Amino acid sequence: MTWITPKKAIMLAAAAEGGTKLNAFDNALLKMGIGNVNLVKLSSVIPAHIEWLDELPKNIPIGMLLPTVYAHIESDEPGSTISAALGVGISEGNEGGLIYEYAGYCKREEAEDMVRKMVEEGFKVRGWKLKEFKVVSAEITVKEKPAAAVAAVIMFPY
C-alpha cells in the first residue's frame, strides 16, 4: 500500500440516534456522508498547504480508505447531553497545522472551548503562530434511543 500526503480536507459533524450505540455512531457517519467508507484514524498534524473543502467530493468509492481525525461519543442514558468537537489550527503561511479532538458528557460550547485550548497549547509548545482557528461540533440529548455525536476531519489524497 502506498500512502500519499493528503491535499484536501473537510470538517464534518453530526449527531444521530440508533437502535444501539454502534448504530447511532453509524447513523451519524451516514448523516455526514462518510458511512460507506473506511476511516483510518490519524493523529493530529495537518500537512502544509492543504485545501479546505466546503462539501464532500462526489462519487467516493464504497470502502475507500480515508485518513481521518475524529472524536465520537455514544450514550444510552436518557437525559444525558453528549458532544463531540474538533478544533483545527492553521499556521502562518499555511505551513501546516494541528487538529485536536474532544468528546464528552457536555454541551457543544464546552467541547468547542476545550479543543480551542488544546490547539492554542499545541501551537505554543511548537513555537508556531496561529493564523486561523476552525471548529466543528455536534451535540445531542439522549431520549429513548441510544445516541451518538461525531466530529471529523476527513483528508483526501486528490
Curated annotation (Swiss-Prot):
Cofactor binding remark: Binds 1 pyruvoyl group covalently per subunit.
Primary enzyme class: lyase
Record bears the keyword Cytoplasm: no
Reaction(s) the record says it catalyses: L-arginine + H(+) = agmatine + CO2
InterPro entries per UniProt: Pyr-dep_his/arg-deCO2ase, Pyr-dep_his/arg-deCO2ase_sand, Pyruvoyl-dep_arg_deCO2ase
Superkingdom of origin: Archaea
Biological process annotations from GO: arginine catabolic process
Signal sequence, renumbered to the chain: none
Disulfide linkage: none
Pyruvic acid (Ser) sites (modified residues): S44
GO MF terms held by the record: arginine decarboxylase activity
Keywords: Decarboxylase, Lyase, Pyruvate
Cofactor list: pyruvate
EC annotation from Swiss-Prot or TrEMBL: 4.1.1.19
Site residues, Cleavage (non-hydrolytic): S43, S44
PANTHER family: PYRUVOYL-DEPENDENT ARGININE DECARBOXYLASE
Family to which this protein belongs: Belongs to the PdaD family.
NCBIfam families per record: pyruvoyl-dependent arginine decarboxylase (TIGR00286)
Protein name (record): Pyruvoyl-dependent arginine decarboxylase
